[in-house]
Amino acid sequence: MPQVVSMINWKGGVGKTTMTLHLAAGLATRHNKRVLLIDLDAQCNLSFLAIGASSYITHAYNKNGPTLKNVFDNYFAHAPTIAANIILQKQVRARAGKIYTQVGIILSHQELTLLDMKLAREKRSGRDHREETKFEIEKLSVIKAIIDEVASDYDYVLLDCPPNVNLVTQNAFFASDYYVVPAIPDFLSTVGISLIKKYMDQFNSDYTSMWSYAGLPGTYVDTKFGGIVFNMVDEYGGGPKDGHRQMIQSTISQQGKSSVFANYVTDGDGISAAAQMNLPVFAYSDLPRAHQNAEKQANYMGQVVDEFVTRII
């Protein structure tokens, strides 16, 4: 069974989507792992980064190709979804003219913006409250059902969550073994981490109770906290600058040393230069104008990937 990980932060601009893509790339190249990416955010940023905006538009709009929207459309229509037909294989760009053969992706769609309201309105009447609870669990299990269908094909599944706790995000949590919080070392990025953990503890408790009450086989397995990984860290003299170092230390003091990745990703123009070409920063040899910074960021990102493997087990 794959390790399923939700990437979440309620604060935008922390590099969550970039981190998700690079974890997949690093897991594939550094650790020879098979990875499935799922873009749950209606902004579609992971989809754009992974295959390129023009390729995405051609696939999702010009050709009306499958996206996550089709999965939920089938749920509302009480129709089955064949997971293999939704996943794009050998489309995630590795470098100029090359793709990752071990990374698949389920693309997002902008119409997912309205999905949460539609899910909230979806009510199925049961013979009793227990059966209605089963129906509520089905609503939370749409993503999990897709993952379970292709579980033997992947070692990791990474879910890029929107910055909220709506029913789409709850679908991701329900399916996940872990959740990881990308952050930048500033107050606004880190202030909500305790609240995220509080909500996750509550979700775990609620889901456990629902599962038991519905009389489903087995037990619900909690989604565990995988850690906080810092991104866009300014360095000086071989370590974080004072302001960023203090914020990282403050987070460690509040959350515990084991809650924070020992490795981080530095700030620089390498990742942004790579993103403009729809490439991961690991393709730094294709980025002559930002080669030095890109190579440095690639090395730091690689260390984060290696630590991720030791944490998510």
Where are these regions (language model features)?
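P-loop NTP-binding core
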Residues: 1-313
